């Protein structure tokens, strides 16, 4: 079974093409027009062992909001499409990741019920040109369009770059765990028989 997807999204604000291979090796080719997001998506894919190719062009002359949110939408849709009927997956993933002084956790349930809990209290600030509140916008769009419960918790940390990096790494690792195939799972991991 090949678990891949290619998604294109074209709006008046963004043009995005994304290809995902869930069963990859963490290889990436990413160009979003938002350098800090490129860095975070590289980390997400590398630590989740997903192959990810992304080309995006957005109205970044205004700000990065539309591009970041729309990439979250497209990445979520790609996972949803690649997972298809979710047969044989673990469904759940939970990881805690350190990044120097920072510790962050991500918990995933590929349930078909989108919900984000984002306990990452950050000041209104920037990392380079990137508004840190856009990380939450990205994860909200990703959770909604992937159809997952996603809980991200910052246990502690000071450096904004490290905090966001730990969150992306943790989500990548948790998604890897949740999407992993388990030969013991017959059908889907649900007493309802559907996810």
Swiss-Prot record:
A Pfam family matched in the record: IGPD
> A Gene Ontology molecular-function term?
imidazoleglycerol-phosphate dehydratase activity
Report the SS bond pairs: none
Domain of life from the UniProt record:
Bacteria
What GO terms describe the biological role, i.e. biological process, of this protein? L-histidine biosynthetic process
One GO cellular component term, please give it.
cytoplasm
- PROSITE patterns to which the protein is assigned, alphabetical: IGP_DEHYDRATASE_1, IGP_DEHYDRATASE_2
So what does this thing catalyse?
D-erythro-1-(imidazol-4-yl)glycerol 3-phosphate = 3-(imidazol-4-yl)-2-oxopropyl phosphate + H2O
**Gene3D superfamilies reported in the protein's UniProt record:** Imidazole glycerol phosphate dehydratase, domain 1
Record keywords: Iron included? no
Localization (cell): Cytoplasm
Q: List the pathway annotation.
A: Amino-acid biosynthesis; L-histidine biosynthesis; L-histidine from 5-phospho-alpha-D-ribose 1-diphosphate: step 6/9
Which principal EC class is assigned to this enzyme? lyase
Q: Where does the protein principally reside?
A: cytoplasm
> What EC numbers are recorded for this enzyme?
4.2.1.19
HAMAP family noted in UniProt: HisB
> Which protein, by its recorded name, is this?
Imidazoleglycerol-phosphate dehydratase
